[in-house]
């Protein structure tokens, strides 16, 4: 419920803030909250670990949210909600390509199609769909960024730190 409402609330806030300002406020609140929950500073062992954290921060924290917020400037929140729901599909494809141990089965494709159709009908509820190519394409790029982030996050999680430490 909260996840789905972010598109609408972000769209409203973008009337008063730029995408960068909105992200700054959002991440500042998140960072301060995480500092309270986990005040200990994470010490990384080597440069390779730092690269994984930089990639996760760049793809999943900055680029995904920046592109998504920018897309909301050009298209409807409903479009973003529906289009971004394809991120798990991109994630599965990328995980299969990067980690051959991740199975890619036909039941996933069928389940994805059924879920996407359900999300589409719930989101549009009989209303006409309004396409906005610039915003809709940016949303697809955001979904791809989330897929890259998800694959990078698998590597970050293998470093053995807690989720709060990884997020902070």
Predicted regions, residues:
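Juxtamembrane C-cap of transmembrane helices in multi-pass membrane transport proteins
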Residues: 2-17, 29, 65-75, 83, ...
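Cytoplasmic-side transmembrane-helix entry/capping segments in multi-pass membrane proteins
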Residues: 48-58, 103-116, 135-139, 161-168
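Juxtamembrane helix-entry segments on the extracytoplasmic side of multipass membrane proteins
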Residues: 16-20, 24, 45-51, 124-145
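Transmembrane alpha-helical segments that form core, pore/gating elements
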Residues: 31-34, 91-93, 129-168
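Residue-level hotspots within the lipid-embedded alpha helices of multi-pass solute transporters
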Residues: 57-61, 85, 139-147
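Small-residue-rich packing faces within the transmembrane alpha-helices of Major Facilitator Superfamily
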Residues: 4, 24, 28-32, 116, ...
């Amino acid at each position: 419920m909260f996840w789905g409402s972010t598109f609408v609330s972000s769209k409203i806030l973008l009337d008063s803030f730029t995408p960068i300002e909105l992200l700054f406020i959002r991440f500042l609140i998140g960072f301060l909250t995480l500092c309270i929950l986990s005040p200990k500073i994470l010490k990384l062992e080597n440069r390779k670990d730092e690269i994984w954290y930089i990639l996760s921060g760049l793809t999943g924290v900055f680029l995904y949210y920046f592109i998504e917020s920018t897309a909301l400037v050009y298209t409807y929140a409903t479009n973003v909600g529906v289009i971004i729901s394809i991120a798990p599909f991109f994630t599965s494809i990328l995980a299969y390509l990067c980690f051959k141990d991740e199975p890619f089965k036909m039941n996933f494709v069928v389940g994805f199609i059924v879920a996407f159709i359900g999300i589409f009908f719930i989101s549009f509820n009989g209303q006409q769909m309004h396409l906005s190519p610039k915003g809709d394409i940016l949303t697809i790029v955001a979904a791809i960024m989330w897929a890259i982030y998800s694959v990078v996050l698998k590597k970050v999680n293998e470093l053995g730190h807690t989720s709060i430490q990884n997020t902070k």
